[in-house]
């Protein structure tokens, strides 16, 4: 089936020029159930999605916080240009590496992309491993004030100098009730909580914001989570990281440094980039290469563990074991289930 001639990657707004409540118009446009395809890094989501899209007459929306950036190609295992020409993809290569892109931007742009796809009687297929972005799509954008970059930079310097545990102790003094609900190692939530206190003058626990995951109400979704045995996934990740280095990941990091990736605190801290930025900053010592490579692999494996934990919160993502199955067979299983129950 030939993909329609549509410039999917041209969607570049940050949400200010789309409808204020996109879910309301979403319900009017709904004709088919939206497919959610998740899985840990290295589980084969991309290959499965490319097989699945023609089976269901679908178009693909990337659920990846780093694939939005032009030039971050090797380290994000970005789908090839040839594949994007065959099957329309959204939310890939839409930002310069210095631009900030957050969950609110994702919510509006992903919603706009799905509206576009549904309006042409196609099936949106959301594909990725970012549990937070899936949560945002299903539950709406995060509540609370927008991020304060200057304050976050201040906290980053504090952590670098004093450590995260002291920052957590600070939160415990300012908002002990909320601090008890998170771990002392959850840097993102600690920083966000202190940021909210700084911006609003109120404790997080005093705000009437919902922090729980919600099921989508205004449109139907059906989700799958690709599952592989841990030892197999570990072997795949080791091979994947080595191949990225063989494909000149370090050269890509050099180019991104020239383009100003340091100005973007999210992009510069992404796995696969932060390790090699530090390596380059140290003068690229040959004796440190193996240690940095092993750290790159270890950080990826730790992230996979977090991905598994996140998606366990969502029963709507049906676990789909993939051991011994080809991407095409997995896609056929999803398509069959989709047409039976979607």
UniProtKB/Swiss-Prot annotation:
The record marks 130, 152 as: Interaction with substrate tRNA. Pfam families: IPPT. Keywords: ATP-binding, Magnesium, Nucleotide-binding, Transferase, tRNA processing. It comes from the Bacteria. It catalyses: adenosine(37) in tRNA + dimethylallyl diphosphate = N(6)-dimethylallyladenosine(37) in tRNA + diphosphate. Its EC number is 2.5.1.75. ATP binds at residues 39-46. One of its GO terms (molecular function) is tRNA dimethylallyltransferase activity. One of its GO terms (biological process) is tRNA modification. Residues 64-67 are annotated as: Interaction with substrate tRNA. Its cofactor is Mg(2+). InterPro entries: Dimethylallyltransferase, IPT, P-loop_NTPase. PANTHER family: TRNA DIMETHYLALLYLTRANSFERASE (PTHR11088:SF60). NCBIfam families: miaA. This is tRNA dimethylallyltransferase. The gene is miaA.
